[in-house]
Structures are given as C-alpha cells and as structure tokens.
Amino acid sequence: MKIGFIGLGVMGAPMARHLAYAGYEIVTVLNRSPLPTDLNASVVTSAAEVARMSEIVITMLPDTPDVERVLLGQNGVLEGTSAGKLVIDMSSISPIDTAEFAAKFRQAGTGYLDAPVSGGEVGAKAASLTIMVGGPASEFERALPIFQKLGKNINLIGETNGAGQTCKIANQI
C-alpha cells in the first residue's frame, strides 16, 4: 500500500521510517527538512500529487495554518484526492478547524481522521506514541494497522472529527 506522508520533520521522519520498514511504500513532497536517506521514498512536487499517488495521506505539520495550506491550498491534498481515500492528520491543531477540514474532504468522498500524538521525538523514534483519534469507527479500523506501527496506546476518542484534537488539548493542560 502507498502511504503519502507530508511533514518529515523531527516527528514525521521517524514515523515515516517505521511505516517504510513495515513494508508500506512512502510518497512524500519536497519540504524544508532533508529527506532521510534510508526512507527510500518517492518524492513528488505537490501535496495534490502525493494524494493522487496514495491510498492514505498522513500529515504531521507544526500548526493549523500549515495543515490548512497543505490540505486545502493550491495544489493541496484536497485537489488530488478522490472517493475512497483516507486523510489522517497527526498534527496538533485546532479542533474547530479540524472539523471544517474534515467536512471538505467528506464532501469529496474522502475519509478523514484527526490523530494527534503524545510522546515527543523519543516516542516517535521508539514507535511508542500515544495516538488520540477522532473520526468514524470504520475509518479508525482501516487506519489501525498503520497506527500500530507508530504507537502503543491508540484510542478512538470519539466518532466526531476534532475529538482527538480536543483530547490532545486536555492532555496538555
């Protein structure tokens, strides 16, 4: 299975590496961080192209404006997605914006999960992250084998998009 992974920074690079080592084919876009040499990923020029080439797209980005730009901006994931695909945002962002992003993807027939993590760089490297997921149970079940390559404590917080982000905020307090 091809997984698009956008955001290969401190957290995203080790997460993508775990997926590659598990046998998933990784597709990514040129970004600020240099591509890890052991990742053996296909590199394309836009988030839309990542979406076209992948069954599932994962984003792990610094903040809400970055996620919005990558998902909904020009040449963003939404432009390249189609019915039956799944977007998983693992960034820690606004639950309100998350619900709005999810609605736009659902209109395109694309599934959407918010799945922020706790555990930091150490957890990302050790594949021991806590993953707090918001979205439909059927999409959670579809993504669970992927989550199990990234974390140890994986919970569907609620079947509403934004539930994972809300839990993450509460976890930070």
Descriptions of predicted regions:
Residues 1-58, 85, 121:
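NAD(P)+-binding Rossmann beta1-loop-alpha1 motif at the extreme N-terminus of oxidoreductases
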Residues 2-3, 88-89, 172:
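Short, contiguous strand/loop micro-motifs
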Residues 5, 68-73, 152-154:
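Short, composition-biased local secondary-structure segments
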Residues 7, 11, 15, 35, ...:
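General structural feature for long, well-ordered alpha-helical segments within catalytic domains
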Residues 7, 28, 59, 89-90, ...:
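Small/polar loops that bind or transfer phosphate-bearing groups
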Residues 44-52, 56-57, 64-129:
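Rossmann-like NAD(P)(H) cofactor-binding subdomain of soluble oxidoreductases
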Residues 92-172:
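Rossmann-fold dinucleotide-binding core
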